[in-house]
Amino acid sequence: ADAAVAASAALAVTTPHMCGMGGDLFALVHAAPGPPDVLNAAGRAGSGADPDRLRAEGLRVMPFTGDVRAAPVPGCVDGWCALHERHGRLPLAEVLGPALRLATGGFPASPLLVATLPRLEGVEGCEELTSIRPRPGDRVVRPGVARMLAAVAEGGRDAFYRGEFGAALLAVGAGEYTDDDLAESGASWRPPVGRRVWGHDVWTPPPVSQGYLSVLGAAVAEAVAGADLPDPEGDGGAGAWAHLLVEAARLAGHDRPAMLHDGADGDALVSDDRVAAAAAGFSPDRRAEVRGLGAGGGTIHLCAVDAEGTGVSLIQSNASGYGSLVAVPGTGVLLHNRGVGFSLEPGHPAEYGPGRRPPHTLAPALVTRPDGSLHTVLGTMGGDSQPQIVLQLLARVLAAGESIGRAVRAPRWVLASGTGQGFDTWTAGEPIVRVEADAPAAWVEGLRRRGHEVTVASELDVAGFGHAHGITIDEDGTRIGEADPRAIVGAAIATA
């Protein structure tokens, strides 16, 4: 847990284009045989949230950027503190030390950071990023974020939410947030959602996470094909493999806008009845006729397993790149835009309103054996496509018997709308299937023959296919980790 918090904090410093202290966080923690604990650190809309006002302004959907109302109270720091309080061993100041040193002493700018910094042009209150024009490798310092980290290290969550950051958030919020919104931790521990699939127990966070789609999709694929899945790369079965999993994801996810909201029953969403109903729509020869309701994300996933076998699957996000493009002045912190998940339809179960949590794309996963021991921690960035990518990893590791390394490196597909936004797969009409350039030709031919609309990405286009990572623990305790080559990342083993 200490390693997960330390890595998450370091990424909050070095990858502001994907995550930060102004975002949200989920984690699955397996510390003893049995189901994992789930940490939900998704923030709630402020007390000033008023859907009628947005509708009166002529909005039919939530603002995406440039509007503080797109940002519920950030939950990330509450998540760090809650995870450390329950499972940490080292002092919090020591855990946050590496991130603080990166913020004060600087870190080399990555090519992706350099390429995305122009998106902040015109954003006020974040001069530590808007005033620099680094080249790849140039040193970047984050003095405002360093002060915020130092406050958390010394005084915990209250020093952040009730200190300089909190005061500045109330000011920039202009009535969207109140003192009471910041008084209590927004993080809570919850039981997971899960079911047995391919001989293992697959776990994800409950709603508001969309993680149930990974479990439901895997269960649908198993119900249709059992454990004997087609060969994902062979000419004879590759098209059937791709069709099976694409359809499992579509049949599981097409009604997500109506089903996923704060307070939704996660167990009911992966029930036997739901699995059977979805599986009944599958045909091996053609695309099912399912519809959503009509009309590039910024996230990181990390995982860690310690010497005692405690495993953490953690995901942290700004939602979209630099989030709402609203900075909390003087702090170096950019606010996320997770409020884009709310609905402005009157009476909708996910309607924007005070104290409500929006539906979340964040969907980490964890797998245990029937005896309750830890098998795999895994997850990915990728907006709406996260459960689809996790489904493909689960199918390869649990059903096809592949190593986590081969599964992570293997070609992928994702479902996507035509907008490229990454958060409207199920609300912008029938999604298309985007396939990586190195995928087997049989995938494309087999999917098109069955009625799917397919586009093939260019060789340089890997951004839309997630950055997945995982650690598998063999029965003898051997850890095998894989970091996605699509990202600038790594897997490491440390001894103390």
Residue spans of the language-model regions?
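Alpha-helical support elements that line or immediately flank enzyme active sites
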Residues: 78-86, 154-168, 221-222, 380-405, ...
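Amphipathic alpha-helical
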Residues: 148, 161-184, 262-284, 308, ...
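Noncatalytic scaffold domains of N-terminal-nucleophile
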Residues: 2-156, 160-162, 166-202, 206-209, ...
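Short beta-strand scaffold segments in enzyme catalytic cores
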Residues: 10-11, 19, 23-31, 300-305, ...
